[in-house]
Amino acid sequence: MADNLPSDFDVIVIGTGLPESIIAAACSRSGQRVLHVDSRSYYGGNWASFSFSGLLSWLKEYQENSDVVTENSMWQEQILENEEAILLSSKDKTIQHVEVFCYASQDLHKDVEEAGALQKNPASVMSAQATEAAEAAEAAEATEAAEAAEAAEAACLPTAEESLSTRSCELPAEQSQCMGPESSPQVNDAEVGEKETQSDAKSSTEQSSEILPKVQDNTETPKRNVITYSQIIKEGRRFNIDLVSKLLYSRGLLIDLLIKSNVSRYAEFKNITRILAFREGTVEQVPCSRADVFNSKQLTMVEKRMLMKFLTFCVEYEDHPDEYKAYEETTFSEYLKTQKLTPNLQYFVLHSIAMTSETTSSTVDGLKATKKFLQCLGRYGNTPFLFPLYGQGELPQCFCRMCAVFGGIYCLRHSVQCLVVDKESRKCKAIVDQFGQRIISKHFVIEDSYLSENTCSGVQYRQISRAVLITDGSVLKPDSDQQVSILTVPAEESGSFAVRVIELCSSTMTCMKGTYLVHLTCMSSKTAREDLERVVQKLFTPYTEIEAENEQVEKPRILWALYFNMRDSSDISRDCYNDLPSNVYVCSGPDCNLGNDNAVQQAEIVFQKICPNEDFCPAPPNPEDIILDGDSSQQEVSESSVIPETNSETPKESTVLGDSEEPSE
C-alpha cells in the first residue's frame, strides 16, 4: 500500500479520534490534500466503539501492545544531514488498570462464536487452531470437574459465591482467553449481510428456547430471562461499546457543526428520555422541562412554583447580576441554600440539572451550567441530550467520510515511525512510515498518544476512570423498556469525584434485547475499579445462578463488567511538549466532560492555523451544482470503501438532525 501512496500532501493527520477527524474533514473540504493514517486497525482511537468480540480483541491487543516493543530502523536511511528525527511512540499507553469480570452463566462451548463474525486473518486462525489442539489434549487428561474449575480459574471469572469486590482480573498476557472464546475474531459490523443477521437472530432465539424451557412454560409467574455468556457472545454484533461515554447537547458545538457541515446525514440519534437522581439510596426521575415539572407527582405545588421561578431566573441570570453578585466567591451549593429552595430541589438542581460539584463549582459556573441545560431543552425532545445510534464511535467515522468525499486518503494499520525536522527552520518537513517511505507535507496533525516519552517527559496527565457494564435491567423500573437515562451519583468523601452513569437500552443499537449497556465515568483518584465500585454496588448486584430464580431481587444484575483508566490530556498546552515544530499540531484524547465541546474547539483552532480565514466545515455544494472535471469514479470508490454505510437496522424512532427547532417526538 505504501508504494501506491503519493509522496506529497498539504496536511498529514495521524490518528482518527474525533478532533483529528474533524480537522481532516475541514481541511479536505477547503481544498487541502489530506493523508489520514492510523496505526490501529479501527477508526476512532480512544473515541471508538466495538462489538462485544471486537472489544475482547481490543483488550487482547492492548495487552499484547503493552508487552511487545517493535524496533524499526528504516527511518534512519531517510534522514539527511541537515535534518533530525522526532521518533513517535509505537505503544499506546493511554489505557491502564484493565480489569474484567463475568457473572453471566458459564455455559460457553468452544464452537460458540459471534453471529455473523468474519474470519480472522490466516495467521490468527492457525494460531487459534494450534491453541485449540493443545487445549483438547489437556482436556482429555482431566476430569469434567477439573476442567470446569480450570476454565473458571483461567478466565479470571468470579464464582457464584464471590461478590464484585472479591475477585479481580488484571489482564495478564498468558490469560487472554479470559475475555471470551478463542475463536472470537475482530469484527467489521458493516460487512455482514442483512440475511446473515436475520438467520443468526433466529438461531439465537432457538438456542435461548432450548436453554430456558421453564421460563417459557411458566405462564402464571413469568420470570426474568436467564442471559448466558454464550448468548452475549452469539449476539455480540448487537453491542456497540464505547471507550468514552458522552452525550451531545442539542445546542452544543458538535450538533451545530454536524448540521452546518451536513455531516449529520451520515448519522442518526436518539433522545435521552430520563434525567435521574440518586438520593438517600433510591433512584428517582427528575422533572426538568416545564411540562415535567407541572406533571410531577414528586413535587408539591409550592415546590413546583419555587423550581420554575428559579429556573426562569437561571436562563436570564446574566441580565440580573445583582441577584448573585454577592455570592460569586461561594460555591453553587451554598448559593442554592439562599434561594428558598427545599433540600429536595437543591439536590435536583445541583446534581441532575447543573451536574456540578458540590464542593468546587462556583456560583457562576453553576448558573452557567444550568442555563446551558435549560437552553437545550425542547429542540429535539424533552431533555437536552442526544445519543448517536451505534455509539459515540460513529461520529469520527462520519467526519472521515466527509474527508474522503472531498479527496482525503485513508490508511489504517499504517504506523508512522518519525517526524522529519529541518535543523535550520525547525519546521517539520515530512514523515517516515513503517515501510520507510518519506512523505512530504506542509502541516502535521497528531494525536497525543503517538508522542514519545522524550517529547512528553515534562507532562503530567490526569486520568479518567471508566466502567462498562452489561446488565439485565434498568436502575429505575421504566414504563417502557426503551429508556435512555443519565444519572449523577455525588461524591461521598473528600478527594473523590461525582460519578456519571449513562444507561443505554437496545433501541440505541448498542446492546442486545433484554440487556442494558451502562457506562460509568469520573475523574480518577485511584484505579477505575476503586473509584467506581462503590457506585456499582449501590445500583447493581452481581448475577448469580441462585438469584436468577429469585424474582425479589430489586437491583438490576450485572452480567459482565469492564474497568479501565483512560488518560485525559485535554488540559495540556503545546508548551508542555519538548521541541515540537510550529507546524505540528497536537490533539488531545477524550476529556471527562459530558459534552464534546472541547474536541470541536481544538479542531477549529488547529484548522484556523492551517487555513486562516477559511470557513470551518461549510456545507457541501448541492450535487446537482457540481461540475465534474474528468472521471469521478475513483472518488466514488474511495467514498464507499473508506467507511461502512449506516447500518440498515436503524430504529424508526431515531432522530435525524436538522434546522427545525420543534421536538422530534
UniProtKB/Swiss-Prot annotation:
Residues 167-187, 200-210 have a biased composition (Polar residues). Keywords: Cytoplasm, GTPase activation. Its main location: cytoplasm. GO terms for molecular function: enzyme-substrate adaptor activity; GDP-dissociation inhibitor activity; GTPase activator activity; small GTPase binding. GO terms for biological process: blood vessel development; intracellular protein transport; protein geranylgeranylation; protein targeting to membrane; small GTPase-mediated signal transduction. It holds the Pfam family RAE1_2_domI_C. Residues 167-219, 620-665 are annotated as: Disordered. The keyword Flavoprotein does not apply. GO terms for cellular component: cytosol; Rab-protein geranylgeranyltransferase complex. The keyword rRNA-binding does not apply. SUPFAM superfamilies: FAD-linked reductases, C-terminal domain, FAD/NAD(P)-binding domain. Residues 632-642 have a biased composition (Low complexity). InterPro entries: FAD/NAD-bd_sf (IPR036188), GDP_dissociation_inhibitor (IPR018203), Rab_escort (IPR001738), RAE1_2_domI_C (IPR054420). It is found in: Cytoplasm, Cytosol. Belongs to the Rab GDI family. Substrate-binding subunit of the Rab geranylgeranyltransferase (GGTase) complex. Binds unprenylated Rab proteins and presents the substrate peptide to the catalytic component B composed of RABGGTA and RABGGTB, and remains bound to it after the geranylgeranyl transfer reaction. The component A is thought to be regenerated by transferring its prenylated Rab back to the donor membrane. Monomer. Heterotrimer composed of RABGGTA, RABGGTB and CHM; within this trimer, RABGGTA and RABGGTB form the catalytic component B, while CHM (component A) mediates Rab protein binding. Can associate with the Rab GGTase dimer (RGGT or component B) prior to Rab protein binding; the association is stabilized by geranylgeranyl pyrophosphate (GGpp). The CHM:RGGT:Rab complex is destabilized by GGpp. Interacts with RAB1A, RAB1B, RAB5A, RAB7A and RAB27A and mediates their prenylation. This is Rab proteins geranylgeranyltransferase component A 1. It comes from Mus musculus. The gene is Chm.
